[in-house]
Curated annotation (Swiss-Prot):
PROSITE patterns: PROTEASOME_BETA_2 (PS51476). It is found in: Cytoplasm. It holds the Pfam family Proteasome. GO terms for cellular component: cytoplasm; HslUV protease complex; proteasome core complex. This is ATP-dependent protease subunit ClpQ. Keywords: Cytoplasm, Hydrolase, Metal-binding, Protease, Serine protease, Sodium. Belongs to the peptidase T1B family. HslV subfamily.
Length: 181
């Protein structure tokens, strides 16, 4: 078992808070659920940064380690660490073959980092990746827009993942939720 073939990660910045959620399902191949409670969202850099991944397990752990090293190297500068990781990921012969995507965030910044060298900061403070990403993204945008002050970032992150889990067969309801205050 070497791959998270299907996963949903969702991140939102709302009312001065940052939250990220991920489901726990690990699917092997196209038909077998191998695990229900995988932890695909983590706190890094002494709890000041959240990171979530979709993609191959070993590749994602390699990228977590590389990203955390870049955070240390650049004293917690999230944008600089993400750009430097993307540059290395794209240009290194071994890293270039890694199959994963990352969402990283701190209190001020939310970024998507991919192996093609892209570092994308969304306009609306919301990102989602993985098989249920589009469902979570749509739900999260609607919740953020219409819930206004009545929902917290954590509540939006949880509800977006719950919605994705109701629609996407590769997303379950075992939600891991992390928040920065």
């Amino acid at each position: 078992m070497s791959s998270f073939h299907a996963t949903t990660i969702f991140a939102v910045q709302h009312k001065g808070r940052s939250a990220m959620s991920g489901d726990g399902q690990v699917t092997f191949g196209q038909a077998v659920v191998m695990k229900h409670t995988a932890r695909k969202v983590r706190k890094l850099f002494n709890g000041k940064v959240l990171a979530g991944f979709a993609g191959s397990v070993a590749d994602a752990f390699t990228l977590f380690e590389k990203f955390e090293a870049k955070l240390e190297e650049y004293n917690g500068n999230l944008k600089r660490a993400a750009v430097e990781l993307a540059k290395e990921w794209r240009s290194d012969k071994v890293l270039r073959k890694l199959e994963a995507m990352l969402i990283v965030m701190n209190q001020d910044t939310l970024l998507l980092v991919s192996g093609t060298g892209e570092v994308i900061e969304p306009d609306d403070g919301i990102l989602a990746i993985g098989s249920g990403g589009n469902y979570a993204l749509a739900a999260g945008r609607a919740l953020k827009k219409h819930a206004g002050e009545s929902m917290s970032a954590s509540e939006i992150a949880r509800a977006a993942l719950e919605t994705a889990g109701e629609i996407c067969v590769y997303t379950n309801d075992q939600i891991i939720l992390e928040e920065l205050e």
